[in-house]
Every structure is written in structure tokens, then in C-alpha cells.
């Protein structure tokens, strides 16, 4: 592949002129510009993106770090971010941290070296964010709010209302023994959902019952077994997310339970799988696409010198499907 010096020689111009044509940083005589473009086309020359980024202090890259790309919530979130980035002339670089702080810091260092224009991140590590404050590029947190972090923008759903909505729906469906499969309580969104569950239980005089659970399908299978052993009279289950709701359904039906006649199940997120699965999962929907697009817009607005909203909270919505059934 030709170098910028070779392109300049073939076009009869200086390397600086070739650079100006590529970057559009200054006016170039049209005749010279056409000569340069013709040589670029003939030689297949491609500019070094990293070198350009280092020179311009911008790569038009938005970094995204998520804890588990296998979780459909995060893959759908990444899709929304990429689409919004592309529409605005940016590229997305996706990193998977596996909830590993060391990997988070390594990915942040890499993005900093690449002169990323911003970072959208899902993390529960205050230490990671503390390190971010020294890197100088804009950061948006998604889904998880960290303590003592006031300067970083966050985009999330109203998880507290989501917990209330899920619990109230099961009560309206006639459930009296409701078990909440609460997500990890070091994660703010999981804490808020469980708090919503607790408050509705108190309001309606329902006994609080819970199983600690993660967010994966495999964990859901294990925890569903634990739940049915610990709470044999359960008639309503709030799963930590839709994938766990699906694993709960599988476990219960294998044990001979009819859903929703014997036990009703509600998930959280409204991932695509929740309506492709049979029966379709009743869920509390997060506006995943809106969250991803908003996070991306904040990065771009920051880069363009605009003021940004630090706290961005989206409403959630009950989606009634086939794993719950109202009385009557």
C-alpha cells in the first residue's frame, strides 16, 4: 500500500497538501485536489487512522465498556449506541470487562491511547471511575449509579418504579406469596428495584421474600431450584431480568408447574427474547434503545461544547404477556 509521501510524489504535490486534502483542514486548489484524489483512488491509499487521531487529538471513536456482552440487554444497548454513533460520524469500539476491574482499567488505558472522544460505561467500581477522572475524556455511566460521583453523567431507567410496578402487577393478578429474585445489591439498579418491591409489600401487607440472584440464564436455573425449595408456596416470582425469568419458567415446568396458573412470573428489561420465547414473558420494559442513543448524544454534545444533563432517567413500562394473568 502506498504511503502519503508516495501519493504526494505521484500527484506532484507536497505531503502536507495530501494531508490537507485527506483531513479537509485547509483550502486546496481544486486542480491539485483532483490530482491527489485520483492518485489515492489508483493506489488504494488509506490514511493511518491512529496517526490522524494522535495529530488531531480526536479519533471519532466512542468507547463502550460493558460487563457481559452475552447478556442481551448489553448487546441491544451496544447496537443502539453504534447506530447513533454512526449517524453522527463516529465509530464505536466495544470492550467486554467480565466485571473485572483490572480489565476495565486496561480498556480505559487503551481508549485513552487511541484518543477516544468519550466513554460509555457500565460498572459498579468506584475505583475505576476515580481513575477515569484523570483521563480527561467525557464519560457517561449507564444503568448503574455510583456513590460520591456527581460530575459524571448517568443514563438509566427508573428502577425503583420498575420494582413497584412488577410487584403491584403480581398482586393484581392474585398473588399472595411473591418472591423477588433480587440482583446483586452492590449494583444500584438492583438495589432500587428491590426497594420498590419492599415498599409495595409494605403497602399491601405482603410478606417480603427473596432469593439473591445474578443476571445470567445459567444462574437463573440454579437459583430457581433454590427458590422452589425454600418457598414451596410461592405463587408469584419477580425475576432479576428476562433471561432469569426464562430459566425460572424452564425449571418450574420441568417440575410439573403450570405457568401462569400455578405460579406467575415477571421479568425485567424487555429484551427481544422475552417475546420470541414461548410463552411470551411478562416484563417491565426498559427503553434500551433510547438509553443507548441518549448516552451517545451526551458524549457528542460534550465534545461539541454544549451543556449536558448530568442525570437522565427514563420511565419504565409494564408489558403484559403470557406468564401472568389478571383475575377475572
Describe every region a protein language model picked out.
Residues 2, 57-168, 227-229:
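Alpha-helical recognition/docking segments in bacterial nutrient-uptake
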Residues 15, 33, 59, 78, ...:
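ATP/adenylate-binding site constellation spanning eukaryotic-like Ser/Thr protein kinases
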Residues 23, 68-71, 99, 183-188:
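Short histidine/acidic/glycine/proline-rich micro-motifs that form metal-
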Residues 42, 83-88, 137-141, 145-328:
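Bacterial carbohydrate/catabolite-sensing allosteric modules
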Residues 42-48, 102, 120-123, 221, ...:
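Short gly/ser/thr-rich secondary-structure transition/capping motifs
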